[in-house]
Amino acid sequence: MQNLDPQELEKFEKMAKSWWDPNGDFKPIHQLNPTRLQYIQQQANGLTEKKVLDVGCGGGILSEAMAKQGAIVTGIDMTVAPLEVARLHAKEQGLVIDYQQITVEEFLQKQTALYAEKFDVITCMEMLEHVPDPLSIIQSCRALLKPNGVLFFSTINHTFKAWALVVLGAEYILKMLPKGTHDYDKFIKPAELLHWTDQANLVCKNICGYHYNLLTGKFWLNQDVSANYMATFQHKSI
C-alpha cells in the first residue's frame, strides 16, 4: 500500500494552476522560500554541485530555488498536475531538474534495484503532516542519504497556537490558504518528530521555528517551535 492520502493529493491537484502565482494559493510558500533556502544553505554548507532530493516537491518552488544555487536536483511527488507545472516552469527558466511521480518509498526501492544512489542533501518540507505514515517517509529519506549528508524536515506543531495561526488565521480569517489545506489532527509535535528520527538512526543537529510578519510579508527564524518549525538531521555516526 502506498503511503499517501488521496484526499490530501486532491487538495494540491486542484491548486496546481496557481502554484507559480506569487499572489495565489501558494503565496505563503513563495514568501517562505527565501528564508528556508537560506537555512538549508547554511546548514548544508552550500548547495553548489551537491545532489539534492526534494521529497514532496509539488510544483517545484524549492526545487528550482536550490537548482539556481547550483544543486543537481531530483524532485519527487505523487501529484500529477503540480509535477507538470513544475516541469514546464523549470523548462521556461532554463533549469534541468529531474521530476518524477513516485513515492519516496518506491524511489528507494528503485534506487536499490538499479544502483545505490545517495544524496548530499534531502529536503522534505511541509509534507509529513499530509501523509498517513510519517515514519516511513523518514526511514526512506535516511536510507537515501549519504553518510555525511544533511536531511531537512519542516512541519507544524500540534498546539493550540499552531491551530490558531495556521488553520483559523491563515485559512479562515486572512484567507492566505484555501480552507481545508491543513488537518490539525495530523500536526506533529517536535518530540514526535525526534522520536521517529531516533528510530531511523538520525540525530538532530538544529531545530528552529519560523514565523510570519503580516506587515512585511516576510518570515523569520527563532527558537520558538510552538507553531511552524524545521529541523536538520544527519546520520547518528556523524
Curated annotation (Swiss-Prot):
Gene Ontology biological-process annotations: methylation
Entry keyword annotation includes S-adenosyl-L-methionine:
yes
Read off the Pfam families from this record.
Methyltransf_23
Name the reaction it catalyses.
a 3-demethylubiquinol + S-adenosyl-L-methionine = a ubiquinol + S-adenosyl-L-homocysteine + H(+); a 3-(all-trans-polyprenyl)benzene-1,2-diol + S-adenosyl-L-methionine = a 2-methoxy-6-(all-trans-polyprenyl)phenol + S-adenosyl-L-homocysteine + H(+)
| Protein residues bound to S-adenosyl-L-methionine | R36, G56, D77, M125
Instruction: Could you list this entry's UniProt keywords, alphabetically sorted.
Output: Methyltransferase, S-adenosyl-L-methionine, Transferase, Ubiquinone biosynthesis
- What is its pathway? Cofactor biosynthesis; ubiquinone biosynthesis
According to its UniProt record, the EC number is: 2.1.1.222, 2.1.1.64
Q: Which InterPro entries match?
A: SAM-dependent_MTases_sf, UbiG_MeTrfase
**What Gene Ontology molecular-function terms does this entry list?**
2-polyprenyl-6-hydroxyphenol methylase activity; 3-demethylubiquinol 3-O-methyltransferase activity; polyprenyldihydroxybenzoate methyltransferase activity
Q: Which NCBIfam families match?
A: UbiG
Stated family = Belongs to the methyltransferase superfamily. UbiG/COQ3 family.
Report the function annotation for this chain: O-methyltransferase that catalyzes the 2 O-methylation steps in the ubiquinone biosynthetic pathway.
PANTHER family associated with the record:
METHYLTRANSFERASE, UBIQUINONE BIOSYNTHESIS O-METHYLTRANSFERASE, MITOCHONDRIAL
Recorded protein name is Ubiquinone biosynthesis O-methyltransferase
Q: Which organism is it from?
A: Histophilus somni (strain 129Pt)
